[in-house]
Amino acid sequence: MSGLSIIIPAHNEAAVVARTLRSILANKLDRPLQIIVVANGCTDQTAEVVRGFAEKVELVETPVGSKTHALNLGDRVAKYDLRAYLDADIELSDNALQSVVDAFKDPTVRLAMPRAKHTYRGRNPLLAGYYHLWRSMPYVRKGAMGGGFYAIDKELRGRFREFPSLTADDKFMRNLAKPQERRVVEGCFATVTMPQSLGDLLKVKTRWTYGNLELSAVRPDLNANDQNRHEGALSYLILRPWLWFNVPLFVFVYVYAQLAARKRFALKQAIWERDESTRPFPRTTAAATPAAHQAA
């Protein structure tokens, strides 16, 4: 029986990576498990935190602050054909690993992921309303928005040599698989803590939008495998007037992200603006350089 290799790129994630590792180790799996954390360009205590799990977690360190580089380094260390890739700030439910692995019993499945659970822990009623509306959108409910965790089989991994230098590495992988080859596994979760402030939300949405533009330009051949995020949204809203109060902020965030991302894309300004509101102080910042925009 083949095992599962999990690769976790981590850039200055000392505040959250232990929580993520504990959630993985709380899972039971019917096969060998290899956990690899690639600490890339860290200036905090990420590596030291990971060493606290030394008996069960392999640590790879690189001075290059690049998520793409970290993913490729992790892939070189991985020893199993079944691979999973996990963001360092994501929590898995205790049945996620087995449930996702079981999805590959279907020979047509090439990529599997748990249902994403997007949580907002702040107290701003406007942001709470925004997330309520966003989570209710058809494309989100269908699982189009990933939860920072996905697993792939050997066949899908064979469709590319190395991870390309893209902001939207997760969407690249998702679109590499045809819709009928993807599986969102119900009954298990990957918990994503959403930005707690409007400023951080705008940064993250701009990054997502930039990543979509970049992927579409670099790999237009994958557009056919993408999902129309706007399909059914208007009719859904028209029939639910109790959501209308949240529409103005929703539209503002969408328009802001579109304009900001398109401007930066036109100027070839690669970005990686992550949400710092869900990471306790001290905060870290990354300059808008080709290396920094790929930092995990």
Please place each PLM-identified region on the residue numbering:
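Catalytic donor/gating beta->alpha subdomain of glycosyltransferases that bind UDP-sugars
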Residues: 104, 118-121, 126, 165-226
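Acidic helix N-cap motif at the loop->helix transition within catalytic regions
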Residues: 15-18, 43-52, 95
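Conserved donor NDP-sugar-binding/catalytic core segment of glycosyltransferases
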Residues: 94-125
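A conserved acidic beta->alpha catalytic loop
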Residues: 23, 39-47, 64
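Short aromatic/hydrophobic "clamp" motif used to bind/position activated sugar donors
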Residues: 83
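Glycine-rich, basic loop-to-helix element that forms the pyrophosphate-binding segment
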Residues: 62-78
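Terminal low-complexity segments of carbohydrate-biosynthetic enzymes
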Residues: 194-195, 203-296
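Short, well-formed alpha-helical segments that are part of the catalytic scaffolds
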Residues: 12-26
